[in-house]
Amino acid sequence: MKKVLTLSMLALCVSHGAAAAQYALDNDSIALSFDDASSTVVVKDTTANHPLTPQELFFLTLPDETKIHTADFTIKHVEKQDNAIVIDFTRPDFNVTVKLNLVKGKYASIDYTIAAVGQPREVAKITFFPTKKQSQAPYVDGAINSSPIIADSFFILPDKPIVNTYAYEATTNLNVELKTPVQPDAPVSFTTYFGTFPETSQLRRSVNQFIDAVRPRAYKPYLHYNSWMDIGFFNPYTEQDVLGRMDEWNKEFITGRGVALDAFLLDDGWDDRTGRWLFGPAFSHGFGKVREKADSLHSSVGLWLSPWGGYNKPRDIRVSHAKEYGFETVDGKLALSGPRYFKNFNEQIIKLIKNEHITSFKLDGMGNANSHITGSQFASDFDASIALLHNMRSANPNLFINLTTGTDASPSWLFYADSIWRQGDDINLYGPGTPVQQWMTYRDAETYRSIVRKGPLFPLNSLMYHGIVSAENAYYGLEKVQTDSDFADQVWSYFATGTQLQELYITPSMLNKVKWDTLAQAAKWARNNASVLVDTHWIGGDPTALEVYGWASWSKDKAILGLRNPSDKPQTYYLDLAKDFEIPTGGMAQFSLNAVYGSNTSVPGEYQKAVVITLQPLETLVYEAIPAK
C-alpha cells in the first residue's frame, strides 16, 4: 500500500506574516492536498486524474441567515499526523478543526469538529465541502436522506444519516441542520467520506466494498434463533422456556447437524415493562443461567430492546410509567433524545453489555427523526441513537447491532449498526400461492420498493428481512406446519439474499427431519460462501408486478445466482450474466452453472452467452457459477 506525505515550503507571505506551506498525501487511489495560503483543498482521483476542489472547506449559517465562511477564520495551526493533515481554524466565536485523512489504503475522509468559544452559540446549519462545476453532472444516488453523492468518478457520503446530501446543476454539498446550540466543551463532529469507482458498472460494488472496509464490524453471517412468534408474542416468557428451546436447538441443529448458532436472541417479553429496561420477574437474577448454557453450546445471548417502548399493549404499559420516572415522550412513545430517558436507556444497555455479556442487540423503534425535545443535547431521536450506538461499540467493539423500525436505506447507518429494517410489516402476504409463497413475495416486494428503488447503493447484505418464519405464534398461515418444499423455498431464497443478519423465527416442533436437514444445509452453505454473498445485489424485476427477480453476487473465483418467479404462471427471464453479475470490463463472462437448489432444464450447464430461460410458477432457483477455464 502506497503511503506518501510531502511538505513543500513555499516562499510566500500571507496576511499573518508566516511562510505559506502546501501539504500533500496520497494512497493507492486518492491524493489529498492543502494549501494554507489560500485554504484550498484538493481531493484527487489519481487513476482517473480527476480533482475535486471545494469552493471552501465549510461554512456556518446562523439563525439570522448570516454566513461565516472558511475565509472568515484564521488558520491557527497546521500539522501532519501519520496519514492525516490537521488544520485548526479560529475566530472569536468558533473554533473549527478539519482533519484530512487517508483511509484503508484507497479512500479518504474529512473530519470536521466545531466548538463554540466562550459561551454556547446558535448555528442553524453547517455546510461541508461545497463544490461548483467540479464534475460534469453530479447527482444524489437515492431518494433517502444522506444517500451518496456521485460526482464523475467519486462517491461522497456522510458518516451520519442525519446529514443531508445535495447535488443540483453541477453544485454539490453536504449539510446538517442543528437544533441545539454549539457548546464550548462539547464540540459537534461530522465526517465526509470519499471513494472512487473505475467504471459506471462498478459503482455499487465499489460503494459496497468501501462500506465493508470502514464499518465497525466487517460483514460476517450472524445466525441466531429469535424468540419472537415462538415462546414470546406480546407476552412474558420464563427462563425455563428459554432453556428448553436452547436444548431443542442443540439437539436438532448445533450438535445434531453440526451447525454453529451465533446466538439465542430474547425478543420482547424479558423486561419488567416499567420502561426502565430492568429484568422482569422471570429473570430476577439476570441472564446468568441462559448465558451459561449458551456458552456451553459455543453460542451467546442476544437481546431485544425498543428505544421508543415497543408495540401494542406492552408499549402502552411501558409508556404509562414515563411520568413516574420523569421519562420524556413524543407522540405517545418514549423519546430516546429525552435527557432523562436517554441517561437511563444508555446506562442499562451498557450494563447489559458489561455485566450480562450480551453480544447482539435488536433495537426496535428508533423514534422521531425531526422533533427536538427542549433541553436535550440531541437534535432528534436519530441523533441520540447515533450517540447510543457509539457508546455501545465503545463497551464492546464486536457487538452485532440490528436497527429495526425507524431507520431508512441510508448507507451511513452502517457506520454504526450492522443491519437495518427492510421496511413494511413484520410479515404479510402478497400475490398468488400458499401463505409461504405469498409471504416470500411480500418480503421481497417490500425490499424492492423501500430499499432497492429508494436506496440503490444500500448493501442488501445488511438488511433485516424478518428471517425465516415457521412459528406457532406467527400469523397469516405461517403458524401452520409448512410443506417441505415451501419451507425449502423460503430457506434458500432467504440465504440467497446474502444478508448477514440471519434470523430464525422457528418453533422447533414444527420442523421434521427433512426441514432440519434443509435448514442446516442452507445455513452452512451461506457461511461457507460469505466471501461471495457479501456482494449480493438485486437482479430482475419488481415482485409487486409479479416479475421474475432475484439476487446475484460475484467474485473473481465464484459467483452466485438466485432467481424466483412470484407468479402462478410460467415466466421467461433474460439471463445475461455479464449484466447480472456486474462483471468488470474484461472480466470472464462464461461460466459452469451448478444448481445448489432446484433444477431447471432451460438453464444451461455451460453458460456462453445471454439466453432466455423459463421459470415455472412459484419456482425458486439457486446456482453457483464457476468461471470457465
Predicted feature locations:
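Active-site-adjacent "subsite" loops/lids of carbohydrate-active enzymes
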Residues: I231-P236, S300-E356, G367
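Active-site groove signature of glycoside hydrolases
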Residues: G258-W270, F345-G375
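The substrate-binding groove and active-site-proximal loops of carbohydrate-active enzymes
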Residues: H224-L243, W270-H285, F327-N344, G367-F382, ...
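Aromatic- and acidic-residue-enriched segments that line the glycan-binding/catalytic groove
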Residues: G275-H285, G309-V330, L414-D426
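Sec-dependent N-terminal signal peptides
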Residues: V4-C13
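Active-site-proximal substrate-binding groove within the catalytic cores of carbohydrate-active enzymes
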Residues: D185-A186, S385-N600, V612-A625
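Conserved structural scaffold segments of CAZyme catalytic domains across common CAZy folds
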Residues: A84, T90-D93, K104-S109, I114-D316, ...
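Acidic-aromatic substrate-binding/catalytic surfaces of carbohydrate-active enzymes
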Residues: Q22-V86
